[in-house]
Amino acid sequence: MSSKNKVLPKQPEVNIGTIGHVDHGKTTLVQSLTGVWASRHSEELKRGITIRLGYADMAIYKCPKCEPPRNYTVKPVCPSCDTKAEFVRAISFVDAPGHEALMATMLSGAAVMDGAILVIAADELCPQPQTREHLAAAEVIGIKNIIIVQNKIDIVEEKRARKSYEEIKNFVKGTVAENAPIIPVSAQHEINIDVLLNAIEEIIPTPERDETKPPLMYIIRSFDVNKPGTPIEDLDGGIIGGTIAQGKFKVGDEIEIRPGISIEREGKTVYNPLITEIVSLHAGEKSIKEATCGGLVGVGTLLDPSYSKADGLNGNIAGKAGLLPPTLSELTLETHVLERAVGTKELLKVEKINPGELLLLHVGAAVNLGKVVSIKKNMVTVKLSRPICAPSSSRVAISRKITARWRLIGYGIMLVDEPT
């Protein structure tokens, strides 16, 4: 079923996250849909788990002759009747790591997800710790369009598959995924992939985007594509990757990246925004002249590649020079605390936030430590360890250290709109 067509007919217009517990088959599912193994880094391949955010694109096609759900495919020719299929839309997948130690990476990816596929393995009891944690994270970030994939149905007997289904139904009761469809799938053998594609079309529509606003892109990856020993005159500039939340970018545009890079000045660390030019745009494995909202986009720049290597610009925002939100070193949040911490084996009550406490904050794709400096009812002011750039009213995921790990305890709405 997987599409081996690398070049998509159009730029992806929606980002779908694959979330869930480690080893439940998220990356295998993405491969069965896209033909791309999203865990491409050597350490990931060696350990068999996703460490960084994975990403892959696919096109959805619809056969004009076959009945649903069989009419949905990832190939331009219908595999059932050999009829030329009609292109529906292109999609980017963001494959989030399921290991508890990598929750911060999952939350950074959640910031750019328009919908999510929660993958739950039928051969394990539900919920596993990160199944619970990832669903809570999706709820906190505000992801409402969710599909549940009951994976690995090929390795369990029918009785266990039915029991697993009941466990899933009980687990999602009262959550944002209470009414989500539960689709039994074998990602390994590509069973029921057409049913999943049908559900994606029904449950995760392309959000309305405003392309008239000043462009704004969340950076979730950055690279140096040059091989060691490349002569200086042949070096390519740094590459940034992410999703455009509003507006559009064109080749030749001058852009600003905030908060930028840290430099030492008079014994203090300050952050300098970067100004550069877009020299190339890539989406869906092809070069484009203009990139619009939705999907994952690669942006070639004239930046010194030492800035962008090894995800060095992750968490920054890119936009037109002078039109980005202010850079902030302090945030005031209207906080909403969960009843129970998520991700722990035991269900622990969340205590109230205290002055002087250290919290881990996810603002857009940025992750940052913050010290609580004042509290007034549910308004919490936090001094950041390093500045961030984010639009006002952004949702901020809040984590606290519990049993030696950062655990999600709630979220806040950013109220600060002035540089500090």
Per-range role (PLM):
Residues A121-D123, K144-R162, I182-I193, G315, ...:
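G-domain G4 guanine-recognition motif of GTPases
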